[in-house]
Swiss-Prot record:
It comes from Homo sapiens. Keywords: Nucleus. The keyword Nucleus applies. One of its GO terms (cellular component) is nucleus. This is Protein PRAC2. The lineage of its organism: Eukaryota, Metazoa, Chordata, Craniata, Vertebrata. Highly expressed in prostate and testis. Also detected in placenta, muscle, colon, peripheral blood leukocytes and skin. The gene is PRAC2. It is found in: Nucleus.
Length: 90
């Protein structure tokens, strides 16, 4: 392609060129998201280390393998043991 045709003329700038400029990208995105949230702080969901992947199974507790696959069985909640809580750092 011809470089002269690819170059933007002074009067023919794209309207989004200012928004995506590298120096103004972060402030413009921040203003955009603050406008969406009603000019308040943005609270993004944070993962909390209490999911299944963070649980450590007791080696003496075995899962029952004699059940049919695909069957769901309700499990009683575990009782609280007197052990120190460990804080997982991310």
């Amino acid at each position: 392609m011809d470089r002269r045709r690819m170059a933007l003329r002074p009067g023919s700038r794209r309207p989004t060129a200012f928004f995506f400029h590298s120096r103004w990208l972060v402030p413009n995105l921040l203003a955009f998201f603050l406008g969406l949230s009603g000019a308040g702080p943005i609270h993004l969901p944070m993962p909390w280390p209490n999911g299944r992947r963070h649980r450590v199974l007791d080696p003496h507790t075995q899962l029952s393998t004699h059940e049919a696959p695909g069957r769901w069985k309700p499990v009683a909640p575990r009782t609280m043991k007197a052990c120190p809580q460990v804080l997982l750092e991310w």
